[in-house]
Structure formats: C-alpha cells, structure tokens
C-alpha cells in the first residue's frame, strides 16, 4: 500500500464529516452511493486490463464496479480522506475477492502521482468539495493518460427535495446559526455548468448530460439515515444532544404528515477523452 499524503484543510473537513457518516453509509436508504457510482463507471466502457484512479472514492461506490469491469489484469486505485470509509471499501473488496483494487488515504486534490498514468480518472460527487474546482479538474486531467477518460459526476438541482427543505427549515427553527442556504454542489447542478468547469480546467470537447432521478424510501423515517450518512452529518454533529433530537422529531414529523418517501436525486454525468496525440506527461514514459 502506498504512503499516505498529508491532508489539506478542505480534505480534513471532509474527513470529519464523512468519517462520522461512515456508520450509516451502507444502510439500504443510502443505496444511491453505489447506484450512481456504478452508473458512472458503466458510461466509460472500461476494457479489461485498464488502470483506473477513483478520487474521493468513499466506500467504493465507483471503485468496486471499476475493479469488476477491468478484471484481475487491470488495476484500480481509490483515494479518499476518510479512513473509516476506506475501511468499508477494503472490506467490500475483500468480500468480493477483488485483489487488484487498492484504497489509500490522502488528499484527492494533491495525490503526488505521476502524470498520464491512468486509462480513466473518476470523481463521483467529490469535485465540488475542492477549494478550486477548476484546478482540481485540471489536476485530474494531468493524471489521465492519452486516449484515457476523465469522468466527473455531480448532483443536479433540488437534491433530496422535498426532504432537504424540511431538514434545513427544522435546523433554522432549532439553531439558526447552523442554517445553510447554499451547498458546495449548488454551483454545478446543470450540464452546462459541468461543461463550463471542464472548459475552465483547459479541457476541450467534454460532454455532459443531466439525468433526472428519484430515490424511494421504505418510509419517511428512513430519511434520517440519509441525514446521518451524508454531508448533513456535519450540521447534526454541531448540535447539542437535545437540539439533535428536536431537529429529528421536527423532520420526521413533517415528512410523516406529508407522506414524503420519494426524494429528488437528479445527476449530471460528465466525460472527456484525452486525445491520443497528447504528449505524455512528465515522469511517464510514452505508451506503446
């Protein structure tokens, strides 16, 4: 296993939030992590023997499907800041006998890896956490080999609505200082916004497609699993125990009253192919 790289401040913040969320990450109510990770990989048409880098890999939602696709002759490297999520990913890989996937703790925005070393670079629901999204996308492009693909997947607008608004209205009622009117992913919720991000990173001819989606819960109470197993967790953990219970009761009560068990989960899939004529990046020999 490779050496861990030091984490930047944004990566440490993500580690705190998603490390805590790991205890709920594999609940059935959060099946969207695996579903959209697999959907991202399926769009790449990975060939057996390919090398794949999965940045902000979490519990393996996209790295594991990639490992299945490339087979034992290929190689997949997943990098994430949250050690507890990586532990989940390693356990899942071991259960499937996927010995050709490695999970490494580190800052996805500064891996220290040589340029052009991967047939595909993937980042699912992670690019918007970088302090400079365009710089992060450009770094991922640097790591993509000639003829390789860079896949970025982001959330579409209205994520988890109508439950999202119920949650934040409840937080504002209990502890106004923690109310958030804006989330990092709100900047790139359309196909055009994602294409613009590729362009700002110096990547030409990228494609992006918005796909509407719905996520169904067994009952409204299961939304609290999503709260504890996603980015909401940072807000919940900042509440006192009493406040946390007040927010939970408000959220669940309102969702039950409105019989809400279907959430909006629109997704935007972006891809770009690095021209075969592109020069190899420094530190990597030309491919044969």
What do these predicted regions represent?
Residues 2-50, 61-65, 85-88, 107, 149-176, ...:
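Conserved class I S-adenosyl-L-methionine
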Residues 4-17, 32-33, 59-61, 183-288:
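Conserved Class I S-adenosyl-L-methionine
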Residues 51-111, 135:
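Class I SAM-dependent methyltransferase SAM/SAH-binding core
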Residues 109-121:
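A short acidic, Gly/Pro-enriched loop at the edge of an enzyme's catalytic core
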Residues 119-133, 156:
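A short SAM/SAH-binding and catalytic strip from SAM-dependent methyltransferases
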Residues 134-149:
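A short glycine-rich, Lys/Arg-flanked "PGG" loop and its adjoining helix->strand segment in the class I
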């Amino acid at each position: 296993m490779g050496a861990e790289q030091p984490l930047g401040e944004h990566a440490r913040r993500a580690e705190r939030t998603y490390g805590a969320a790991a205890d709920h990450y594999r609940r059935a109510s959060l099946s969207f992590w695996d579903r959209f990770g697999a959907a991202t990989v399926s769009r790449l048409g990975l060939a057996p023997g390919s090398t794949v880098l999965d940045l902000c890999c979490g519990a393996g939602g996209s790295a594991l499907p990639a490992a299945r696709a490339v087979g034992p002759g290929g190689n997949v490297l997943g990098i994430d800041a949250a050690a507890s999520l990586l532990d989940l990913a390693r356990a899942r890989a071991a259960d499937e006998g996927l010995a050709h996937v490695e999970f490494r703790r580190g800052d996805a925005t500064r891996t220290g890896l040589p340029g052009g070393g991967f047939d595909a670079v993937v980042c699912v629901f992670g690019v918007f956490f970088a302090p400079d999204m365009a710089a992060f996308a450009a770094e991922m492009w640097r790591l993509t080999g000639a003829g390789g693909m860079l896949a970025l997947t982001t959330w579409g607008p209205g994520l988890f609505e109508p439950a999202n608004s119920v949650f934040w209205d409840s937080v504002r009622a209990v502890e106004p200082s923690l109310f958030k009117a804006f989330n990092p992913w709100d900047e790139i919720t359309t196909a055009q916004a994602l294409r613009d991000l590729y362009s700002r990173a110096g990547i030409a001819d990228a494609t992006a497609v918005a796909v509407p989606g719905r996520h169904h819960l067994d009952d409204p109470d299961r939304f609290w699993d999503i709260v504890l197993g996603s980015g909401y967790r940072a807000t919940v953990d900042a509440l006192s125990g009493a406040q946390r219970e007040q927010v939970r009761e408000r959220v669940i009560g309102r969702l039950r009253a409105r019989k809400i068990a279907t959430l909006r989960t629109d997704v935007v899939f972006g891809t770009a192919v690095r021209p075969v004529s592109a020069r190899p990046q420094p530190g990597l020999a030309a491919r044969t």
